[in-house]
From Swiss-Prot:
Residues annotated for GTP binding in this entry: G13, S14, G15, K16, S17, T18, T172, K173, I174, D175
Species for this entry: Dictyostelium discoideum (Social amoeba)
Protein name according to UniProt: GPN-loop GTPase 3
Pfam families: ATP_bind_1
Function (record text): Small GTPase required for proper localization of RNA polymerase II (RNAPII). May act at an RNAP assembly step prior to nuclear import.
Amino acid sequence: MGKHVQLVMGPAGSGKSTYCDTMRKYCEEIKRSVHIVNLDPAAEVFEYPVSVDIKNLVTVDEVMDELHYGPNGGLVYAMEYLIENMDWLTDELGDYEDDYLIIDCPGQIELYSHIPVMRILVDHLQQIGYSVCSVFLVDSQFILDNCKFISGALMCLSAMVRLEVPHINVLTKIDVLKTSDQYKEIEKFLDLEVQNLVEELNLETHDRYHRMNKAIGSLLEDFSLVGFVPLDITDQESLNVLLQHIDNSIQYGEDLEPKEPPLENDDDDDDDEGDEIIRMMNGNL
């Protein structure tokens, strides 16, 4: 079936680790073997079993102690160190034919928008035979109004344009909002018309921003980036719909051979139908 990757991204607090663990458990339930890769050199506690861990190569604490960097500088250095040692990652991933990886990435947005670390990582994964889908998580509680939605959408756009791979935007923590009145606010963003968004933004902002609102709306519409897949981790159907979106984007399972029905059963069914017809004909004679 080939080798496939979910590259799980999103700002801190968007639920990346919870997503990875939930998706792993769901895949196990549907008999799909997955491996989780931790690429956050600052991660301390895992909610899931880790198959490959960047901290076996480098940690942020080590960088901060040895080079006296701050947390963000230490993270960037650690990720650049990974890029310089891609052979380590290749060896850790192995060379299996049917790999399905879920890669838990750091949350610092500069890794996707300012420096080429994640793009180099994606290119390397593709070179060694992986089909990659970027899964960008946004906390649904973060986009409860139009301005916040624009901010979240532009953040997704930055990662999508930078990486140039199939891209799925996910609204997380829907299960939290379902029990509150705020869920109605989220629903309008799930099937949003850009023109309506621009009109509402114009009502909320000064006249001098109206041209900018229109330009941003056109940008999002041109890139078809107003679509988010809602995720309720307590709902199996929600997980199934999201996984189907991801699978379609990386063509997972398309090379599977269709199963043919057993011939013996078909023959038996045909014989039964023939006997019944003969009995009916005899009864009418």
